[in-house]
């Protein structure tokens, strides 16, 4: 396992539509392990493959209650319900956080790290993570949802970003 460099805006890989993972082989397993280690090292809540420079449809995130890593390969959001205002940050946009609207409940489908089909229904922070990380795969960042510059805030030197928004 290795800690990979996290890409930051304006790196082009963050704005590209990622390609489907064609097969789950040893290189994908290594990428998954590296992404989990990188996410944990950066104290992030989630990470998408483009954030480590790999344009593939693969995301990892930590369950807030268990801190266990969840892996979704070729994820697709199939249902969104409700809305809630959230504060959100991104490891690829360091030093800032924004206020935006996300779904209260999100259902996504994809494959787990072993290639088994899975479906995840998340509420609250898990729904937010599913939306945020899956959008990375289409080149969409949370800042694209901000309605005005007033919704983007710089993190001061003494500010600590809440764990649930370090995505």
UniProtKB/Swiss-Prot annotation:
The active site is at residue 133. Fe cation binds at residues 90, 132, 136. It comes from the Bacteria. One of its GO terms (biological process) is translation. It is an enzyme of class 3 (hydrolase). Its EC number is 3.5.1.88. It catalyses: N-terminal N-formyl-L-methionyl-[peptide] + H2O = N-terminal L-methionyl-[peptide] + formate. Its cofactor is Fe(2+). The keyword Metal-binding applies. CDD domains: Pep_deformylase. It holds the Pfam family Pep_deformylase. Transmembrane segments: none annotated. Binds 1 Fe(2+) ion. GO terms for molecular function: metal ion binding; peptide deformylase activity. Keywords: Hydrolase, Iron, Metal-binding, Protein biosynthesis. PANTHER family: PEPTIDE DEFORMYLASE (PTHR10458:SF22). NCBIfam families: pept_deformyl, PRK00150.1-3. Belongs to the polypeptide deformylase family. Removes the formyl group from the N-terminal Met of newly synthesized proteins. Requires at least a dipeptide for an efficient rate of reaction. N-terminal L-methionine is a prerequisite for activity but the enzyme has broad specificity at other positions. This is Peptide deformylase. It comes from Dehalococcoides mccartyi (strain CBDB1). The gene is def.
């Amino acid at each position: 396992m290795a800690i990979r460099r996290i890409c930051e805006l304006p790196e082009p890989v963050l704005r590209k539509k990622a390609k489907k993972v064609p097969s789950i082989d040893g290189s994908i397993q290594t990428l998954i392990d590296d992404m989990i280690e990188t996410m944990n090292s950066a104290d992030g809540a989630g990470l998408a493959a483009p954030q480590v420079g790999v344009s593939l449809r693969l995301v990892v995130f930590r369950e807030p209650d268990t801190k266990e890593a969840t892996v979704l390969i070729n994820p697709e959001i199939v249902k969104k319900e409700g809305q809630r205002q959230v504060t959100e940050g991104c490891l690829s946009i360091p030093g800032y956080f924004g206020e935006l609207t996300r779904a209260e409940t999100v259902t996504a489908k994809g494959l787990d790290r072993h290639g088994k089909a899975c479906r995840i229904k998340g509420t609250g922070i898990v729904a937010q993570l599913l939306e945020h990380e899956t959008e990375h795969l289409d080149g969409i960042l949370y800042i694209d949802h901000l309605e005005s510059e007033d919704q983007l805030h710089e993190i001061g030197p003494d500010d600590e970003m809440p764990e649930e928004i370090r995505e």
